[in-house]
Regions:
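A general structural signal for short secondary-structure boundary/capping elements
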Residues: 51-57, 72-73, 132, 159
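Mixed-charge interfacial surface used for oligomerization/domain docking
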Residues: 3-5, 11-21, 25, 30, ...
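N-terminal glycine-rich anion-binding loop in soluble enzyme alpha/beta folds
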Residues: 5-66
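Short catalytic-loop micro-motif centered on adjacent basic/acidic residues
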Residues: 61, 86, 112, 230-231
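Short beta->alpha junction loops
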Residues: 64, 115-116
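Hydrophobic residues in alpha-helical segments
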Residues: 53-54, 78, 133, 166
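Glycine/charged-rich beta-loop-alpha catalytic/anionic-binding loops adjacent to active sites
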Residues: 53-56, 81-86, 104-115
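Glycine-rich phosphate- or other oxyanion-binding loops that anchor nucleotides, phosphorylated ligands
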Residues: 56-58, 64-91, 95-99, 143, ...
Length: 243
């Protein structure tokens, strides 16, 4: 039976410790900060991205992983005797999956998987793939299983401000201003089709919003697997995280 390597896009947003524990190789997206081109999670941190946005008033620009980068990764592992399962960010949010599929053409033992998700939603699939590989499941079967699992993911997040959505062209300036004046914190829900939409709207300071949001996600949900709950945060004050 062939050895199996699990790889993923950096948009899975797992910690370095988790990538190491599950032996997952991460391919970074390119991030452009003005004239500086960086690689997500390699030579630029999340904190630097927020600092850049605050100081310049503009958002960093991201670029999908190139076909060539995918080819280099896939070929390196297949030539070493591995089958590869790669977990991509939703095809509705990036060209990464399309590029990975192009790179995998002609490689019968490479299986790109469209997670139909982002961030730790995709990360959940990458970890599950690593667990199945460790149990001896074939790469093709792992990919098929992930295609089933992705439909059961329950992923959402709440925003402190609409400022960055406005700068990214995803909402109007009037909507952003109104939400900020009313202290509205929208919940963004990822559908099992790989798109995002607005869910509940919360009002008040961020500490109250986060606690209300978490309660709202868990109450009445009897399909939660405790060992699979992930709380992902960014640019969040530590005192709120600790609660």
């Amino acid at each position: 039976m062939a050895k199996i390597k699990i790889t993923c896009d950096s948009t899975c947003d797992l910690t370095p410790e988790l990538y190491k524990r599950f032996d997952i190789e991460v391919l970074p997206l390119e991030v452009t900060l003005g004239n500086r081109v960086c690689h997500d999670g390699v030579d630029v941190t999340t904190e630097e991205l927020y600092d850049y946005a605050r100081k310049t008033g503009t958002l960093p620009k991201t670029s999908a992983i190139s076909v060539g980068s995918y080819e280099d990764c896939f070929r390196r592992w297949t030539e070493a005797g591995y089958d590869v399962v790669h977990v991509n960010i939703s095809n509705k949010l990036s060209a990464c999956y399309q590029n990975a599929c192009i790179a995998a053409e002609g490689m019968d033992n490479v299986f790109p998987v469209d997670s139909l998700n982002l961030s730790s939603g995709s990360g959940q699939l990458a970890m599950a793939a690593a667990e199945m590989a460790a149990e001896g499941m074939a790469a093709k079967d792992i990919a098929e299983k992930l295609n089933e699992m992705r439909l059961r993911l329950d992923v959402s997040f709440v925003l402190q401000t609409l400022e960055y959505l406005h700068k990214g062209g995803r909402c109007s300036g009037v909507a952003a201003l109104g939400a900020n004046l009313l202290k509205l914190r929208p919940e963004i829900v990822v559908s099992n089709e790989g798109t995002m939409s607005v869910g509940r709207k919360y009002r008040g300071n961020m500490e109250k919003t986060v606690l209300d949001y978490i309660r709202g996600r868990l109450e009445g949900n009897d399909n939660v697997v405790p060992g699979r709950i992930m709380i992902t945060h960014t640019d969040m004050p530590q005192e709120i995280v600790d609660k």
